[in-house]
Amino acid sequence: MSSSSNVTSLPRLTTAGGVFPREMVRVHSSCNILRSKAKVGGINYFNPGNIKCVEVHKSRQVAVAAVKSLEYETEKPTNQDVVSEKMRVLSERIGTMLQNMNEGEISISPYDTAWVALVEDTDGRPQFPTSLEWISNNQLADGSWGDRKFVIYDRILNTLACVVALTTWNMHPHKCNRGLRFIRDNIEKLENENEELMPIGFEVVFPSLIEAAQKLGIEIPHIDSPCIKKIQAMRDFKLKRIPMELLHKKPTSLLHSLEGMQGLVWEKLLDFRSDGSFLCSPSSTAYALQHTKDELCLQYLLKAVKKFNGGVPNVYPVDMFEHLWCVDRLQRLGICRYFRAQIKEMLDYVYKYWTDKGICWARNTNVQDVDDTAMGFRLLRMHGYDVSTDVFKQFEKAGEFCCFPGQSTHAITGMYNVYRTSQIMFDGEDILADAKNYSATFLHQKRLASELVDKWIITKDLPGEVGYALDVPFFASLPRLEARFFLEQYGGDDDVWIGKTLYRMPYVNSDTYLELAKLDYKKCQAVHQLEWKSIQKWYRDCKLGEFGLGEKRLLLAYFLAASTAFEPEKKGERLAWAKTAFLVETIASQQLSHEQKREFPNEFEHGSSLNMENGGRYKTRTRLVEILSNTVSQLSFETLVAEGRDIKQQLSNTWQKWLKTWEEGGNLGEAEAQLLLQTLHLSSGLDESSFSHPKYHQLLEATCKVCNQLRLFQNRKAHDAQGGISDLVIGTTFQIEASMQELVKLVFTKSSEDLDSITKQSFFAIARSFYYTAYCDAGAINSHIYKVLFENID
């Protein structure tokens, strides 16, 4: 058939560059596999599967114009511009928030404000009159003080503290009476409240507050009730366990609740201040100021009262906490790519104050906790900062881990973050291996007992967060899969933290983040759904179903690509990944004789060569070879248009290597990983010098090794399942985990002469996709595919 036969006329195409001349474009209408063909630099490029197929005999610019014009013709009108503008506004708003981060945005605590209001100046007057004013102005309609989230521990503690402060200064007796009425009507509810919702130190400070109220002549209703007696007994038990000599010997978490203690030796305790405060606690520091008149304590409180216009938070500053948890939320919501510069600044800030013992919620503190330390370690390591596992030593004793050294109880979220951190261990990091075993066991037990209620946060779906972490380990957690689940688990503005009182962190829990994340997800999902239709068309036009694999396998291939390289601008990489993976599986599934296998790569090689030499008129004897050749041409053409680079010969050579391995019965998992990686890198326009970089070869070797292990493991699982063996070991193997740890170390560590982070991450992305399919069962995978690609976001 001549190149001019069966050509239908095409109207002139209007492009951004003007009118596209009719004589430059011809549309073929009689091919089994429709083609667009562009002759650029003397080479014909085929594009199988297009609705309209263009043969262009001009420059690359002309080819680009034709493709863009045809794409424009098939676009449907959408509200894309409106959505894009909304996303731009939200991104700018969030960017401004992140740039303005300082010592932490946090809500005010009536309890701590009351303790500050109790401080006298040298003349016996209120040292902080604006704190009394804040109390007066912030009583709730029911007579209580506290967060809008009703937790009886929080409301009773805040309300009694404010009543004590106002009564001390003989102010607003009617407000005091309303507060006491609230206490009388609600105090017995303490009996039935979940103890996990009890604020930090409540059992110590609440009885002390009752005693202070009684000294003022305030009658506390139901003082002899069982719930009050129980709390007092808890206080006595805890104080007996506190070695006072230890309290005065070195900094401990007890510095946070000094207002609930007796017999303190202030001369010794003053040595434990940090930035003028006792563990960043305004109430504890105010109590110290009452007894010592210490100038540094005064300056700390003056600064806090000024910043918060009379009120004070339950803890301040919270800069390390805010920086880290903000980065974590942005990452898990899938929108961190919009804020790379700000995230680097935030992590640089954290690293500046990182210590060999870990960190706490604020910089320069003399006490560390495992929750902030684990979160910091995890994020810093994942972004290439050099951090040592020695920071966890003080939190471990005989294989058990605690939040503060010597503490016996655990918070769910503390162990949850230890567990998440333990999964990015490098080979040989035994303390993280111990942390993983301990935290995983703890979380599994809590889940089985339906006790996933945290003592540090009231969040929308903590059981869902913990369940996802346990069911989908880090090595299997595809980025878009994690984001899709977290969009449902993240509560935004409604999430509230538990400290000495309930408090909120607007730069950590934000509806603005959630709104942008949902818009971003919907935008990406819409792109993915259109691409899925186009790849289905490719499958049907090529009649690939005749080779034995259904669209379900194609959908899995596309899901893995779209869940990893999900950004709209990565269309070329997604389609190249999905089509390559599916063709690999299709070819490998064919029952061919040794002779047929030997002919296949030869025919592909000669067919590819002839296609380039004679305009594509060479007809291969094997239709599958023809489909492969045309797909390679299509992917090459699309990369030429997008990146301005001719990759056809390199892509053909990469396929030849895989076909040779397949023909010889070699390690197909290893060969497939190499094929996918090089296809991705070629399609993305990766600089050619990167392919010869020493680190590239290290990463390629490590990735191919673990992918081969995973594919063998997956095949064995499938074989065992077919044989009726159902009691498979949960997880993978020690060798696989060690190989993944080796790869993770190469990806997450930086060297003086290194590849860029995005390229290194692509190796982990391919390994992760192999791990995912090897680890997750078919039912889970099917539900994930539906959820990520097709389920609507509310």
UniProtKB/Swiss-Prot annotation:
It is an enzyme of class 5 (isomerase). Expressed in leaves. Mg(2+) binds at D369, D371. Disulfide bonds: none annotated. Its cofactor is Mg(2+). The keyword Chloroplast applies. One of its GO terms (cellular component) is chloroplast. It catalyses: (2E,6E,10E)-geranylgeranyl diphosphate = ent-copalyl diphosphate. GO terms for molecular function: ent-copalyl diphosphate synthase activity; magnesium ion binding; terpene synthase activity. Substrate binds at K238, K455. A motif (DXDD motif) lies at residues 369-372. GO terms for biological process: gibberellin biosynthetic process; miltiradiene biosynthetic process; terpenoid biosynthetic process. The keyword Transit peptide applies. It is found in: Plastid, Chloroplast. InterPro entries: Isoprenoid_synthase_dom_sf, Terpene_synth_N, Terpene_synth_N_sf, Terpene_synthase-like, Terpenoid_cyclase/PrenylTrfase. Residues 1-35 form a transit peptide. Its EC number is 5.5.1.13. Keywords: Chloroplast, Isomerase, Magnesium, Metal-binding, Plastid, Transit peptide. Pathway: Secondary metabolite biosynthesis; terpenoid biosynthesis. It holds the Pfam family Terpene_synth. PANTHER family: ENT-COPALYL DIPHOSPHATE SYNTHASE, CHLOROPLASTIC (PTHR31739:SF4). The Asp-Xaa-Asp-Asp (DXDD) motif is important for the catalytic activity, presumably through binding to Mg(2+). Belongs to the terpene synthase family. Tpsc subfamily. Involved in the biosynthesis of ent-kaurene diterpenoids natural products such as oridonin, miltiradiene, eriocalyxin B and nezukol, known to exhibit antitumor, anti-inflammatory and antibacterial activities. Catalyzes the conversion of (2E,6E,10E)-geranylgeranyl diphosphate (GGPP) to ent-copalyl diphosphate (ent-CPP). This is Ent-copalyl diphosphate synthase 2. It comes from Isodon eriocalyx (Plectranthus eriocalyx).
